[in-house]
Regions:
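Helix N-cap and loop-to-helix transition residues
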Residues: 30-31, 105, 144
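Hydrophobic alpha-helical transmembrane segments of multi-pass membrane proteins
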Residues: 7-28, 32-92, 109-129
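Class A GPCR helix-loop hinge within the 7TM core
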Residues: 88-105
Length: 156
């Protein structure tokens, strides 16, 4: 079976919890940049939780059981969808912090959203195509041929 090192994700989970607790103690959470930061923290919490659960299930002795594989796939989606949102969230946060968000044209916003929309389309069609990842009776997790697209879209 595949062995995953999940120390980073476990630390990220606890760090996200601590930061969320600290964040909810703030008085000015209603500001736009704080709301985006809150979304980023929740995104990270979902991502780290799903990645730890997915890795634990893949390493499980019952990983090839069809039910376990289905739940593992669900956790993979719960990891990948928020993971692909990180560049959009970070970019939005930066644009708001520097005051650029008020000057953004609709064309820019469409161009900004296209990479995320493409990746989201691949993820939503993945159960039928296996383009991003898949599992089989012999392997609980296999990267698909378009997995590098997720990394490419993150850099656009």
């Amino acid at each position: 079976m595949t062995h995953y090192v999940i120390y980073f994700d476990i630390c990220a989970f606890f760090l996200s919890i601590v930061l969320l607790i600290m964040f909810f103690g703030k008085k000015d959470r209603h500001r736009v940049h704080n709301r985006i930061f809150e979304i980023l923290l929740i995104d990270e919490l979902i991502m780290s939780t799903a990645d730890v659960m997915s890795a634990a299930m893949i390493a499980s002795p019952n990983a090839l059981d069809p039910t376990i594989r289905a739940v593992t796939n669900l956790f993979n989606y719960l990891y990948l969808i928020p993971h692909t949102m990180i560049p959009v969230i970070f970019s939005s946060y930066i644009m708001i912090m520097i005051g650029y968000s008020k000057k953004v044209s609709k064309k820019f916003m469409v161009a900004f959203a296209i990479p995320y929309a493409i990746v989201l389309g691949f993820l939503l069609t993945n159960p039928f195509t296996g383009a991003i990842f898949t599992s089989s009776e012999t392997n609980p997790y296999m990267r698909g041929p378009f997995m590098p697209l997720l990394y490419l879209a993150g850099h656009l």
